[in-house]
């Protein structure tokens, strides 16, 4: 009986791990910025990678990069709306698995130019808001 329970527990753990979003082979492109240092941009990308692994089951992040200073400036209201003083916008591409992904995404589809909006205050940690 103990062996059966152990096998079931192991199988459940494997299924849980398999359902996570994947960022293993994600490509990043450096984009010049007058607003943010490369370290700031990398921190924002890191926040989205964590978000993707935790919440984007059945998806594989393939590319992510800074959308540019103009795009971030055009989304300035997101900082104000969220009580922050900075906003950064990233764009990405990701693949959706045939099965096991969110029902709001099309199975087997590749999404491109997906926007991620993050905010922060006083140089703190980036927070994904949209």
Regions found by a protein language model. Name each.
Residues 1-2, 16, 90, 118:
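Polar low-complexity intrinsically disordered regions
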Residues 1-4, 8-9:
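Positively charged n-region of N-terminal signal peptides that target proteins for export
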Residues 9, 18-110:
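Flexible low-complexity loop/turn motifs enriched in small/helix-breaking residues
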Residues 111-130:
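Short beta-strand edge/turn micro-motifs at domain boundaries
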């Amino acid at each position: 009986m103990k062996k059966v329970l152990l096998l079931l527990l192991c199988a459940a753990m494997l299924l849980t791990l398999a359902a996570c979003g994947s960022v293993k082979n994600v490509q990043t492109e450096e984009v010049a910025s007058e607003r943010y240092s490369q370290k700031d941009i990398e921190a924002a990308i890191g926040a989205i990678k964590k978000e993707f692994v935790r919440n984007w089951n059945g998806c594989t992040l393939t590319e992510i990069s800074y959308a540019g200073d103009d795009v971030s400036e055009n989304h300035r209201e997101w900082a104000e709306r969220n009580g922050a003083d900075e906003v950064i916008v990233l764009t990405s591409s990701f693949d959706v698995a045939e099965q096991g992904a969110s029902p709001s995404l099309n199975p087997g589809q590749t999404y491109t130019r997906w926007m991620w909006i993050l905010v922060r205050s006083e140089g703190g940690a980036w927070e994904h808001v949209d």
